[in-house]
Amino acid sequence: MSSFNDPQAVARYTDGPLRQVPGLHALHQMSGLLLHEHVPSNGRVLVLGAGGGLELKAFAEAYPHWRLLGVDPSAPMLDLAVQTLGPLAPRVELLKGCIDAAPAIEFDGAVCLLTMHFLSFAERLQALRELRRRLKPGAPLVMAHHSVPEAPDEKLRWLGRHVAFMTSNGVPVANPATTIEAMASRLPLLCPEAEVDLLEQAGFERHELFYAAFTFKGWVAYAGL
């Protein structure tokens, strides 16, 4: 995740996800709706990996009384979140750090979008357990990120489709084959079955797939009682 401390990479961030993630605005909208099923009008929502601020802005606009806390390890990305939020920024609390930086209080819901695929299996499990520890029983967690089949040929095929989507949206890719191989080797990608297993190990129940777009998958799950 070192690129998120690169000022030029950070400057490109607000445009990049829109061209790389199919239906990003709809993903934010659906995430908010899934949270809204359980989060009260003045509820507390924890956003892990909040740098950039795109989902924070979507939630702040749609649910003006939610108390939003965004956590991210990258100071430049948090600065970008402030810019993205604009006049909404005073309504959002931002913390630099990983999940451990978030206060150990009971939130009404949590979100983690486009973040978990940067974490190893052990780091993901730890992050999910810490998220569970900060949620009220029955509270929703919404997460979405890259998740591809485990078989090498299937993994490369789906990553190829993702890269094709990027390039069709004008994202410059000098060598698609090299990009595909780099993603396969550098990102600790998990298959959907492993993702669900991690949720269960971390203490989440009733997991449901709500979003699938090429390599991206999104789940909602609920903190166990």
Tell what function each PLM region has.
Residues 112-115:
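A short beta-strand submotif of the Rossmann-like class I SAM-dependent methyltransferase core
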Residues 185-202:
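Short alpha-helix
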Residues 102-110:
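A short acidic, Gly/Pro-enriched loop at the edge of an enzyme's catalytic core
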Residues 125-137:
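A short glycine-rich, Lys/Arg-flanked "PGG" loop and its adjoining helix->strand segment in the class I
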Residues 44-46, 52-101:
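Class I SAM-dependent methyltransferase SAM/SAH-binding core
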Residues 202-225:
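Core SAM-dependent methyltransferase catalytic element
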Residues 1-40, 142-168:
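Conserved class I S-adenosyl-L-methionine
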